[in-house]
UniProtKB/Swiss-Prot annotation:
Pathway: Cofactor biosynthesis; biotin biosynthesis; biotin from 7,8-diaminononanoate: step 2/2. It comes from Nitrobacter winogradskyi (strain ATCC 25391 / DSM 10237 / CIP 104748 / NCIMB 11846 / Nb-255). The gene is bioB. This is Biotin synthase. Catalyzes the conversion of dethiobiotin (DTB) to biotin by the insertion of a sulfur atom into dethiobiotin via a radical-based mechanism. Pfam families: BATS, Radical_SAM. One of its GO terms (biological process) is biotin biosynthetic process. [4Fe-4S] cluster binds at residues 68, 72, 75. Belongs to the radical SAM superfamily. Biotin synthase family. It is an enzyme of class 2 (transferase).
Amino acid sequence: MKSDPVSFDSSHDLMARPRHDWTRVEAETLYTTPFPDLLFQAQTIHRRHFDPNHVETASLLSIKTGGCPEDCGYCAQSAHYDAGVKATKLMDKDAVLETARRAKDAGAGRFCMAAAWRHPKDRDLDRVCDMISAVKALGMETCATLGMLTPEQARRLQEAGLDFYNHNVDTSPEFYDKIITTRTMQDRIETLACAREAGLKLCCGGIIGMGEQVGDRLGMLILLANLDEHPESVPINLWNEVRGVPVNDTADRPDPIALVRMIAVARIMMPKSVVRLSAGRQYMTDELQALCFVAGANSIFIGDVLLTTKNPATLRDAALLDRLGMSSPLDGVKMPAASPS
């Protein structure tokens, strides 16, 4: 049964202001709206708050890989699974800074530093704060994902120059325990609160395609949209195949239309948030990515690798955005010479 499109009349104007009281029925009604109407609504809201022809870019570096004590069932960096990832020590600041310089030269406006920890130790946080200050001095936006934080740790990160803290909720509260047992959803919410109270912007989203139902995907969006403040960035990750992890047994990557619907609903429910196409873009055709941009996605990660998984080449991204007539920090990236016809 198809739902009637959600109207934009004066009694239910989705564009009036961000809401924090979304219901399951409203989310399901949006999701099942006829596809052309859903994209029209999402694009209308997108145009109210963003340049619809611009895409932000960010780069992600694993500054400490593997050996994580958490048992996230999708993650190659968990010490619980044999995913072929070798644990490393925390990188030196100079190496991180050089990578950030290259990312900036390649067109990244934001540099994200990720460490596979349950929570950072204070001695490690000292070094991370030095990295953040150095990257900030390059003129880039800074982001970090380091696990759970105390209020004091969040404050220190903010004082070091951190702009965004990434801490995903991963999935719906109902599906969460099927994926992770060593960290609760409440743990995640408390870390988000610590980051927000310290004055950090939030980057918070999740993963789709782990075996969850559509209702779980919508439940994740409802959770995010009903926070006191919407995350400034909402990354939508498409499940990446990772050997040796339990999610392989349940994974069911959504069909392209389902992904576009998810992006559109995220845009409508969180109208001022940047919606990022994150991990999994290597599985998307150019046409699918274009539809996601129409639905309201307006950010991508660039670089050949995201932590331990593959990502489209930056030149491919630049070429796609050029074909679509969309602007981005990649505009200055040199295109490969065209093949002779």
